[in-house]
Amino acid sequence: KSLHPLYAASGEYDDDQLQSDEAKEFGCSPDFNAWTNGVNKKPEGTTTTLRSAGCHCHVGYDGKTAKRSRDIIKALDVFIGIPSVIIDTDTKRRSLYGKAGCFRHTMFGCEYRTPSGFFLSDPKLTEWLFGQIFEAINYLNEFGIEEINNDGTWIVETINSGNINEAKKIVEKYKINLKY
């Protein structure tokens, strides 16, 4: 057999592949929710054969603050998380990872953890993803965080439930380009 990479958001594995302690441990360190400012619950790796892959986005900036990082993550939810509901058809990953507002603080800024490995499946899609980071930052610079905060419940519920119809409404409101 020839080997080839698989770019997928999630996959089910046979029990015999998941017997080691390492295979049962999820998450190397805690991640946070930008919307609640709380720590996300770590998924339990011993109760499921589902495993997932992320395409985390790292954003660095000068004058790092926790609030600014949370604002960036919220904007990324609008410009990446919401479109991912429409573009990425894998709905299983969010049962483990990839919920709205998922991030880690870094030495240089923040790490957005919502996008899945699906975004690595096509170079044009990966390029679109990175372009959306700039769109989110440009939006924050021009309009601030207020409108996004006002839409917070709508954004979070849409991402976490995978509601495509609501995602399309948010895409229209924020004039998000889905072409890649």
Residue ranges and their predicted role:
Residues K1-Y180:
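Phosphate/nucleotide-binding catalytic core
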